[in-house]
C-alpha cells in the first residue's frame, strides 16, 4: 500500500510547528492587507480570502504527502527528475517558438486554465532525487567518481536549464540545497569546498551577465537611499521598525 494513515509515523513536532507557522502567516497577511483591501475593493477580506484558498490547497497537498509511503517516492525519484528536466526544456522551447529569442523570461508553462512554474517542480524533484541517491549510495558517497560526481552532474543540468530561463536565484537555491544535502549525507568536505569554489567561478560571471542581478545586490546594501522599486521591501522594513519597533504597532494598525 502506498497510502499510510497511521498517525504514529508522523513527525508530530514538525507538524505542530508547520501548523503554527500557517496560522501566524494568516494573521500577518490579514493584518497587513486589511486596509489596502478595503480601500481598493471596498471590503477588507479580498487578499486574505485568496490567501486562505492557497492555504487550503497547500494543506491538502501536505496531508496527501503525510499519508504517502515515502518508499514509493524512491521508485519515482529518477523518472520525476527526468520529467522535470523535460518540463524545463519544454517551457523554454515553447516560449521561444511563440515570442522569439529576445523575449521575456520563460519561467511559466501554460496548461489550459492554469500555469505552473517549472523550476519549482524541478526543485522538488532534485530534493527527492538527492534523498534517494544518498540513501542508496551512503557507503560510496565519499568517493568522488562513484559517489559525489553523478548527482553533481544531474543537478548541474537542472541548474543550467533554469539559468537560461533565466531564473538565477532559483538555480542558486538548488545549488545550495545540493550542498546542504550532500553535507548531511557525509560527503567529503573537500569535495563540497571545491564545488563551491568552481561554482563561484562559473556563477559570478553569469550573475554579471544580467544587469538586474547585480542591481538587486547593490540595492540591498544601499537600499535606503535607492528610491527605485528594487529597494521597496527593504525600505518598508526600515519604516516598520521605525514606527513600531520590535513589538510592532498592533494587529491591523
Predicted segments, located by residue:
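Hydrophobic, glycine- and aromatic-enriched re-entrant/interface helices and adjoining loop segments
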Residues: 99-108, 191-253
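Short, electropositive, low-hydrophobicity segments enriched in small/polar residues
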Residues: 29, 62, 173, 189-190, ...
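Signal for well-folded cores of large energy- and translation-related assemblies
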Residues: 28, 135, 184, 222-225, ...
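Conserved phosphate/pyrophosphate-binding and hydrolysis machinery centered on Walker-type P-loop NTPases
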Residues: 162-165, 169, 223-227
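Hydrophobic alpha-helical segments of polytopic membrane proteins
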Residues: 60, 78-85, 145-161, 168-208
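Membrane-helix boundary/helix-loop-helix interface segments in multi-pass membrane proteins
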Residues: 1-16, 21, 27-165
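Short helix-terminus and kink motifs of transmembrane alpha helices
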Residues: 71-74, 128, 132, 170, ...
